[in-house]
From Swiss-Prot:
It is a multi-pass membrane protein. GO terms for cellular component: mitochondrial membrane. It is found in: Mitochondrion membrane. One of its GO terms (molecular function) is heme transmembrane transporter activity. This is Putative cytochrome c biogenesis ccmB-like mitochondrial protein. InterPro entries: Cyt_c_biogenesis_CcmB. The lineage of its organism: Eukaryota, Viridiplantae, Streptophyta, Embryophyta, Tracheophyta. The chain crosses the membrane at residues 18-38, 45-65, 87-107, 126-146, 182-202. May be involved in the export of heme to the mitochondrion for the biogenesis of c-type cytochromes. Pfam families: CcmB (PF03379). Belongs to the CcmB/CycW/HelB family. It comes from Arabidopsis thaliana. One of its GO terms (biological process) is cytochrome c biosynthetic process. Its main location: mitochondrion.
Amino acid sequence: MRRLFLELYYKLIFSSTPITSFSLFLLYIVVTPLMLGFEKDFLCHFHLGLIWISLLFSFLSAPFFRNEKEDGTLELYYLSTYCLPKILLLQLVGHWVIQISCVFCGFPMLQLLYQFGRSGMDWLNILLGSLVLTLLCGIHSCLALGITSSSGWNSLQNLTTLPTLLPLTVFCTSIETEWFHVLLLIGYFFLFVSLFPILVSISLQD
């Protein structure tokens, strides 16, 4: 399983999907302060929310598992001796590792644009939050595997993912980064990890 994870990780490194997603993330975090006029009080109070929204929309653009289904890789995974949900979960984790590495490399720019201080809670919030976003987008991608057209795929992704993330965005993006936000994120994480194998089995049963 460790070898499989490394293979999936290197496959993702040379894929254009993480590059595209991170490019969109950079675009969102740069354009948002420009649109808001660099209002210091607003950016300082809602910086986590704005960063989360930028992460969300950049992650929504990633066609998780769609390319694998089109080229037959999913079928090979299914016929192999490995557990398919674990393979897909490892692929999501590999994508998240690449994404969060890029985000943390750009953290000084985030502090400069959004004018907030260095806080370990911010790092932890973004770390856990991006992992939850990746899992949730992966779940909705599995549910959208039956959609063949790109426009239909994107429409279903946005329609189903955005309402699901509303409670998460409301409770975890305020200026008061209390510990219950972290506990809520951990709860979301374990919920989605437990739901992932079930939803993968349902969506791929055909």
